Amino acid sequence: MFRVLNKVFDNNQRDVQRIIKTVVDPVNALEQETMQIEDLAAAFLDLRRRVQEGGESLDDVLVPAFALIREAGRRSIGKRHYDVQLIGGAALHQGRIAEMRTGEGKTLVATLALSLNALEGRGCHLVTVNDYLARVGMEEMGLLYRTLGLTVGLASREMQPHEKQAAYACDITYVTNSELGFDYLRDNMAQSREALAMRAEHPLNYAIVDEVDSILIDEARTPLIISGAAEKATDLYYVYAKLIRRLQKGEPAEPGVRAEPTGDYTIDEKGKQVHITEAGISKIERLLSIPDLYSPENMDKAHMITQAIRAKELYHREKDYIINADGEVIIIDEFTGRSMPGRRYGEGLHQAIEAKENVKIENENQTLATITYQNFFRLYNKFAGMTGTAKTEEKEFLDIYGSDVLVIPTNRTILRKDSEDLVYRTKMGKYAAVVQEVAEMHATGRPVLIGTASIVTSEQLSDLLTQAGIRHSVLNAKFEAQEASIVAQAGRSGTVTIATNMAGRGTDIMLGGNAEFILGESIEQHLGISRFAPEAENFIKAISRQDPAAEMLGMQIPGMTPEFIQQAQQLQADTVADRARVQELGGLHIIGTERHESRRIDNQLRGRAGRQGDPGSSRFYVSFEDDLMRLFANDRVVAMMDRLGMDDSQPIEAKMVTGAIEKAQARVEDRNFSTRKQLLEFDNVMSKQRDTIYAQRREVLLGPDEDVEESTEGMIADFVDMQLAIHAPADQSPDAWDIEGLQAAIVDAVPQLEGFDFESLRHGSPAQAQDRLLSAVADAFDSRREELGSTMLNSLARYVLLQVVDQHWKEHLHGMDVLRQGIGLRGYGQRDPFTEYKFEATNMFNEMIDNLKSDVTKFIFRMQFGQTG
């Protein structure tokens, strides 16, 4: 095992050394020369010409480009890229996942790869997990890009279409992962070129995904869906929510314990599934007065009852979702603890939860467009990722995305001390110990950050801390509006912060607090200008440096007063003094209140302490009542506590326990990886179909009139061939052909052929019959062109193709949803569900294409042009 670990370490070290030799050293050698260049934008434009006109590759110009970008950072925003940041920039350019510790400056690192790849003129995207980080990143780095002559934009949810178009037309665009994915889907539903948000050419060229593990692994199972209301009654969910209260939860069958399951249903917490027993089926059939719950006409009932039980037993308020002020069920992201407005559980589960909570049930939605992040980001010509924790998931990044992970060295040595876990028998014993440790730390003035896995836990601990007289702040899905402000000050002395799943929070915790953040907020609140306005930015930086010029720079801001400047200077002085005090006390102390299913989430929490060489420490408190331990850990550890006669207040601190926890986490990670891989296998079937439809649709939307006309004629010819294959197959004698059926099908679609002599097709070979019929239909198309004029016909064809494709694709997605939901039952019939799914999905797609061609033919020949508008 150690050999394998050493090999991994050696490979990483070898790659780092190679980048130092080929990138870092040459860039450093150019630094003095680059500092003499007056016009950095002109020099960068010259590199752009070399790439776009001179045939040089991005690798050819990487060294001079990085030198210019570093100098632009130094001049414009006062930040010079460290050598380790150059390593990170090179890794991102290579399309790798760069693992960088918290506080190592990922935002600045990204400017290297983004600016370099922008030289191609095809657009680059910096993808973040929320709007706040996208806006801050764009505004913080905007001046650097503009110094190089590059344009930078922000694409956000509330923008008008023309604003989005301008943002995506920039060299570099900052955008959230969800908005980017939805823009892609919306563009593939657009009815005109003018309605496109993203670039018409090269919309997905290069992207850097921040918090890449959160987006591409944690959110991989959640597809992006654009939906419309489907006409379906929802009141039955209330009926079934009441009905299942009359059912009894039982225990599953277990070898050596019970041969048969008990009760009316059993639950599988690990797989988040429920199983209705034979007794339960009989009871439900009796309550509903139906003979067979699983007969075809009752499948909807069986599905809704199953979802009602899942909603009752497996999805819990304040942990999996919250109810907002408007009575809406809002999902909580299990990995980040963030609320996700607009997201809904699929397959009727969301409606079942709404019925359980007795709030208004929203109409079931019909999918209009959908894609998973797994398949979306693989559409890019090249993409890279940044995160503080990726190495543990390298196998998944390699298997699914073809991206390896490079661990970037830290600029300063990490001083954080990570203690062994303390394991308690019960949750209450654990919480009491946490409160005691917080009290001890708080008494010294040392800041403490407590990480919890749910809102329920954060509120329980908050109550306990309040009872102990310890002032604190709470950060969870209910208080996201104050998120950045709370996190920014979590490093001040005496501060105690409870945070639900710190993963992806995106704001650095600075020891002593973040004076720049507070000052920026004050400027926006009291002076009414953005903290990123040049005059405000210069003032904030001068205050941060305790520069005597701060007073002069401050007075250039409209509305500024001497009193405000004095308060800002005092704030900075207090922050500097507090930072020194906190460092002396040992830095930020992290307390984890339970181990997460993923080691990455635990590592992200630990990583909040010890940034940029600061001191810090961490410890996790675990109990055998925690979900991870209860479901996955080894029973031997519990037995050992029993033998030792340990009470609730006595912890174990042993490597055996830590090992058991890590094995449990590894098992869960493997299971989740298998689930995501299986999801990808199923989604790949849909992905190929989506790629085909979207590519054809894009050709219709953006192609010249002659191409649209050619596509239309091709579809009409295919329709004719299809009818011939059905009614007059070439391997049959013409005497056996169903000429009446052929005539009915063709004339229904092409009424202009009503006078055509179909019976005469029997005289001659099948090929001659095909030629005659295709020629007659082509003549009808020419007549249609003469009737409407070429311009009008092409407008009609474009409109018809888009409308028909969209309608059939929507219906196909619904059919695929139904197929996917029911395919698991095939396993009971000894058939492989995936093979069955792939076979049936392909047949459904081919049938859709045939129906699509049929409808296009009918609309082209029957529709009046005036009806299109």
From Swiss-Prot:
One BP term from GO: protein transport by the Sec complex
Keyword terms, alphabetized: ATP-binding, Cell membrane, Cytoplasm, Membrane, Nucleotide-binding, Protein transport, Translocase, Translocation, Transport
UniProt topology in membrane: Peripheral membrane protein
Catalytic activity entry: ATP + H2O + cellular proteinSide 1 = ADP + phosphate + cellular proteinSide 2
Top enzyme class: translocase
Gene3D superfamilies assigned to the protein according to its UniProt record, in alphabetical order: Helical scaffold and wing domains of SecA (1.10.3060.10), P-loop containing nucleotide triphosphate hydrolases (3.40.50.300), SecA, preprotein cross-linking domain (3.90.1440.10)
Gene Ontology MF terms: ATP binding; protein-exporting ATPase activity
Pfam families with a match to the protein in the record: P-loop_SecA, SecA_DEAD, SecA_PP_bind, SecA_SW
Assigned EC number: 7.4.2.8
Binding site residues for ATP: 85, 103-107, 508
Subunit structure: Monomer and homodimer. Part of the essential Sec protein translocation apparatus which comprises SecA, SecYEG and auxiliary proteins SecDF. Other proteins may also be involved.
Job of this protein: Part of the Sec protein translocase complex. Interacts with the SecYEG preprotein conducting channel. Has a central role in coupling the hydrolysis of ATP to the transfer of proteins into and across the cell membrane, serving as an ATP-driven molecular motor driving the stepwise translocation of polypeptide chains across the membrane.
NCBIfam families for this protein: PRK12904.1, secA
Entry similarity comment: Belongs to the SecA family.
Protein's recorded name: Protein translocase subunit SecA
Source organism (scientific name): Deinococcus deserti (strain DSM 17065 / CIP 109153 / LMG 22923 / VCD115)
Gene name in the database record: secA
